[in-house]
């Protein structure tokens, strides 16, 4: 069975707001995760973030973006939050948003 990347509704809306090159990078990282699984995809594409959270890392000519996701049952990766990154560190607020959405989903 292969891995599947799913976006919650809020993350889909956030992804739609990204510039085209960052959306394309997101799709590429998602394809890598689906094809090889999260255990075999590492830096520079993904890295652990906090608790159960991981981040997809996208960069392009229009900036840097991140997508925070969590592994769920049934070889699913659920994207909880997508945002444009403006500072060196991942903003605490982005992590808190992802954790709140995870709690709502009760995965």
What do the PLM-derived regions correspond to, one by one?
Residues 80:
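ATP-dependent carboxylate-activation loops
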Residues 1-64, 73-76, 84-107:
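Basic, Lys/Arg-enriched alpha-helical interface segments
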Residues 67:
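Portal/gating segments that form or line small-molecule/metal binding sites
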């Amino acid at each position: 069975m292969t891995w599947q990347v799913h976006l919650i509704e809020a993350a889909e809306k956030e992804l739609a707001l990204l510039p085209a090159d960052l959306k394309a990078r997101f799709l590429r990282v998602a394809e890598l995760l689906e094809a090889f699984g999260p255990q075999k995809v590492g830096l520079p594409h993904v890295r652990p973030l906090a608790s159960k959270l991981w981040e997809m890392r996208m960069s392009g000519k229009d900036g840097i973006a991140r997508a925070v996701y969590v592994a769920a049952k049934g070889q699913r990766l659920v994207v909880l939050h997508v945002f444009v990154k403006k500072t060196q560190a991942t903003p605490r607020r982005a992590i808190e948003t992802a954790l709140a959405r995870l709690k709502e989903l009760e995965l």
